């Protein structure tokens, strides 16, 4: 009857609102899209730092910080590798967790060593990158990644 239809509509609306406000679990596709967006955003941002270092290599190679005692030039090359090559793999989700290790290591060195005694405002960017990269490392690359497609292809060949 009319009252039952109204109750059904009200219950449906309340159910939608409840699920929106209190989701029981994240939707796989939505979560993977979020991870993809974060990979692209933070990968491109970190890559821009590597491009800047690469473009100014001649100027920076003699004076780049050497916190590991391996020389300014090698420290710069490793920073460029972490910020450019690994960022590219991170964006595409290729060897995702392996690529993230140098990125996380670079941000640890930047935050704890290079800017260790600086005020937080100076090292805040390295901290943000570090936290985001650790969280994304834990989350994994999502299903919109080369790793996901490679894993699917390898799994289908096992059968």
Segments the model singles out, each with a brief description of its role:
Residues 10-55, 73-81, 85-88, 92-159:
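Extended, low-polarity transmembrane helix blocks
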Residues 1-11:
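Single conserved hydrophobic/aromatic residue that forms the stacking wall/gate
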